[in-house]
Amino acid sequence: EGKAVFPANRQQALAAFAKARSGGAKLIDLGCMQINHHYHGDAFASVEDMLDPHQNVDYAARFLARLHARHETWSMAVARYHAGPNNDPAQKRYVCRVIANMVATGFGKWTANARSFCNQ
């Protein structure tokens, strides 16, 4: 529910997940692609599988491809990946964070449209 956790290993991640669940948290993102357990957990055999980098990235790539097919742009696919269809403010924040991270790591640049959209 909005608290970032950076466990050092799988066991710590599993313990953090169990603690969050026992504390009533429902919306918990797992793994390197931050897949939400509440909405996507049924696509995996277990929480351990959600934490497996190969399975996590494979699922995320397939999910993004489905979103891209539905929404026709990668920006909208990325927006929906994180926040779902009824949360425009969260979608905008997420897309802008993704763009900023891509620029910071040398995988893109700010375009005029992106700057305008993200108020940069």
Can you name each region flagged by the protein language model?
Residues A4-Q120:
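Non-catalytic cell-wall polysaccharide-engagement segments
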